[in-house]
Amino acid sequence: MKITKIEKKKRLYTLELDNTENLYITEDTIVHFMLSKGMIVNAEKLENIKKFAQLSYGKNLGLYYISFKQRTEKEVIKYLQQHDIDSKIIPQIIDNLKSENWINDKNYVQSFIQQNLNTGDKGPYVIKQKLLQKGIKSKIIESELQAINFQDLASKISQKLYKKYQNKLPLKALKDKLMQSLTTKGFDYQIAHTVIQNLEIEKDQELEEDLIYKELDKQYQKLSKKYDQYELKQRIINALMRKGYQYEDIKSALREYL
């Protein structure tokens, strides 16, 4: 068989043979086999050209996808599958990309953690879940997370949360809110407890009284439409306790309010 034409088509080339067979090949394929118009190829060489072209095309697709940002092995595999790359050659493409360090899940984890430390607000548990969803092995994630002390980040987040809620919640509710927020963000209980203790939050009696009377008035307006006397009083007490107010403070406020 003779090559009758090689023509560029966007990112690929068409290779035409005198037996009317047409192939899509990459530039790497042309270079690798030193293909040119008029070259004679036998069936074995043609099969090798086809296989190499598939691998080369798949690798180029992977490199194109990676060029926008760092990707995990799982993400690249999914991308190749979405672009109809033969599943039999995907492992070979991935191995090639990994051998050239285009895909490196360990480096991905390190970059992901560092970015979170610099600009994020997530603790190790949430980070691990996000990375597991990207197909990274648990062993790789845990190895990198264990090397990081998340207390400084937790401290920074707790200070931001404290400033946000310090004039809106009573002391107990404030501490509970900080603890809930930190653990929801993926920090473990011990780190969360330590950084909250380090804030040295003290009770502001004047603020507490102002907050409790505002909440008491709100609950009274809401509940007095349905209940009266003893039941109204008990429901107000329960509502305020759920908001983090102390029982004795509630009783004291009620004596003056009702």
UniProtKB/Swiss-Prot annotation:
InterPro entries: RecX_HTH_1st, RecX_HTH_2nd, RecX_HTH_3rd, Regulatory_RecX, WH-like_DNA-bd_sf. The keyword Cytoplasm applies. Keywords: Cytoplasm. GO terms for cellular component: cytoplasm. It comes from the Bacteria. GO terms for biological process: regulation of DNA repair. It holds the Pfam family RecX_HTH1. It is found in: Cytoplasm. Modulates RecA activity. Belongs to the RecX family. This is Regulatory protein RecX. It comes from Streptococcus agalactiae serotype III (strain NEM316). The gene is recX.
